[in-house]
Structures are given as C-alpha cells and as structure tokens.
C-alpha cells in the first residue's frame, strides 16, 4: 500500500556516523556510513561499513536529498602515498566527488569541521585535513579550484559560519537567543568549528 512506499520520501546520509547518525534536515529515511561494521541505531534504515579514505560511498548515483559530515572531513587525508607503486591519491578530492555523486540535483551537503586555526583541530592526532574559511572555493562555483586536481562535481555555497560544536548550528532558523549565544562564542574564541551548507549543482535525471 501507499503507507509503505518510500520511493518519494527524502533520504539523508550521515558520514562517519557511529551509532548516532545525525539528521539535520529531518529526512524520513536516514542512512549512515561508519568505518566499523555491524552498527545499528533505532530509526535508521541502515549503517553501512566503509572506509571513505580508501573506498567510494557504497550507494548509487543521486540517491540522497542531503548528506552530512559532523567532525568527519578532518579525518580524510589530503594526499595518500603508495610507496610500492610510486603513486599517490587525493582522498579528500575523491570524497568530495563521491558526496556530489550520491546527492540528487539541488541536494544539500551539511558539514561541521574544526577550523584550521583552533587548538581543537590539532589536539586529535587523527586530524589530518585542516579546513579554512576559503577551502570552499575549491569545490564551489565560480572558482572550482579543485578541478585541476580531479574534482568533477560542482557546488554552490549557501552558507558558511563559525560555530561552537556543542551548540548545533542546524539548518532550522535559530531563535534570537541562539544568534546571541553564537556571537558570544565567536568573541570569546570558542567558535572552534566551521559550518558548510552547500547545494549540489547537477542536471536533473
């Protein structure tokens, strides 16, 4: 019956989700990817195991209305060397290609990442990919600077802001109190994270 038809329902994918996939756009169908296998979470369609520093996102093209990455992108290396073959890869570029690939036309990328100039970026020894307020220029129009490195997608930056991670800067319009709190965080140096909200530019099917 129509009650079980999920073909037209919005689908969201959370990268590096652990056992608590995030769903910033409140999509009816929630999926996750984590490096660990066998994970489950209530209300989640599936948590698929994949190492996204090495592997493609294990979903078909244009499957998701939105993708999120909370404290994840900083773990993806910019360059990976294969000494045996004398070659190198660009895992960060590859990941951005994959995110764009699995998003539907006009799909949203929502990412929260430690800023390059804050101590929280460098505290964790697995943080290898510092993000700056100008990194977006490599993946978003008009510049698309990462084209020279093999980036095949195209995004439009809808929003970029600093935030304090424990104050979730979700896409929903915040109350005045939230705006004031975030302003105070910036003034006191506690806004350690950068929020991206991008739109995938691609032709309709």
Regions found by a protein language model. Give the residues of each.
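C-terminal lobe and adjacent flexible extensions of AdoMet/dcAdoMet transferase-like proteins
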Residues: 149, 153-205
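Conserved Class I S-adenosyl-L-methionine
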Residues: 122-158
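A short acidic, Gly/Pro-enriched loop at the edge of an enzyme's catalytic core
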Residues: 54-68
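A short glycine-rich, Lys/Arg-flanked "PGG" loop and its adjoining helix->strand segment in the class I
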Residues: 86-105
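Short "lid" loop at the C-terminus of a central beta-strand within the Rossmann-like core
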Residues: 114-119
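Conserved beta-strand signature within the Rossmann-like core of class I S-adenosyl-L-methionine
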Residues: 106-113
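Class I SAM-dependent methyltransferase SAM/SAH-binding core
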Residues: 10-56
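A short beta-strand submotif of the Rossmann-like class I SAM-dependent methyltransferase core
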Residues: 66-72, 78
């Amino acid at each position: 019956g129509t009650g079980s038809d999920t073909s037209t329902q919005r689908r969201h994918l959370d990268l590096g989700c652990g056992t608590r996939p995030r769903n910033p756009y409140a999509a009816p169908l929630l999926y996750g990817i984590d490096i660990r296998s066998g994970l489950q979470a209530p209300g989640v369609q599936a948590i698929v195991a994949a190492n996204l520093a090495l592997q493609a996102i294990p979903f078909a093209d244009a499957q998701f209305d939105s993708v999120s990455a909370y404290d994840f992108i900083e773990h993806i290396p910019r360059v990976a060397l294969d000494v045996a073959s004398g070659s190198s890869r660009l895992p960060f570029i590859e990941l951005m290609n994959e995110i764009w690939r699995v998003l539907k036309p006009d799909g949203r990328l929502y990412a929260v990442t430690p800023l390059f100039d804050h101590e929280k970026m460098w505290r964790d020894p697995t943080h290898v990919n510092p993000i700056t307020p100008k990194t977006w220029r490599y993946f978003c129009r008009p510049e698309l600077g990462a084209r020279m490195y093999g980036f095949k997608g195209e995004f439009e930056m809808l929003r970029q802001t600093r935030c304090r991670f424990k104050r979730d800067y979700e896409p929903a319009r915040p109350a005045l109190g939230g705006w004031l709190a975030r302003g105070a965080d910036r003034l006191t140096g506690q806004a350690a994270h950068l929020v991206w909200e991008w739109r995938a530019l691609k032709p309709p099917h």
